[in-house]
Regions:
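Small/aliphatic-rich secondary-structure junction motif
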Residues: 2-53
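General small-molecule cofactor/ligand-binding pocket signal
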Residues: 38-40, 86-90, 141
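A short acidic, glycine-rich active-site loop
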Residues: 57-69
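Structural beta-alpha unit
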Residues: 76-110
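Glycine-rich, Arg-bearing micro-motifs that act as flexible, cationic patches
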Residues: 112-134
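Short, flexible loop segments at boundaries between secondary-structure elements
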Residues: 135-144
């Protein structure tokens, strides 16, 4: 069974990533056959001042709500195509969490967008993508 971590952030690139994964699975390509999809959204920590003003339940609701919002389109696409997946919400440094979670799940590959929703989108290779490439020891597919 091929385990793939699909990293999404709610950006336009995330939609393309999910469409790419769907195509790989349905067309019997690289992921054809037996595949386990792990859809991952990582929320960066709020600034300390803001986080300290919130209690634990408020923080959990904030992170979970933001993650669900960012994953909504990706989840709908996968469900529409009847592709089984597990959704994971993580918190912290995005690139580090993606790589660490791929290791803990025993993933064979990571598929993610080449850019996210950052300020300089489209100008440079996204900083998260560049860091994941640097940290990961498994194959990574970047979707433009």
């Amino acid at each position: 069974m091929h385990k793939v971590l699909v990293a999404i952030d709610g950006s336009e690139h995330s939609g393309r990533v999910v469409q790419y994964v769907i195509g790989l699975i349905q067309d019997g390509g690289l992921l054809g056959g037996s595949v386990e999809v792990h859809l991952v959204n990582v929320q960066s920590f709020l600034p300390t001042r803001i986080a300290q003003a919130m209690d634990s339940d408020e923080l959990t609701r904030y992170y979970d709500g933001k993650s669900a919002e960012e994953a909504q389109k990706a989840i709908a696409l996968l469900k529409q195509q009847r592709i089984a997946f597990t959704f994971h919400t993580l918190r912290g440094d995005v690139a580090s969490k993606i790589v660490a979670h791929s290791k803990s799940l025993g993933c064979d590959s990571i598929i993610m967008g080449s850019h996210g929703s950052g300020f300089l989108e489209g100008i440079f290779l996204g900083s998260v993508a560049a860091k994941v490439i640097q940290l990961s020891t498994i194959p990574i597919t970047l979707v433009k």
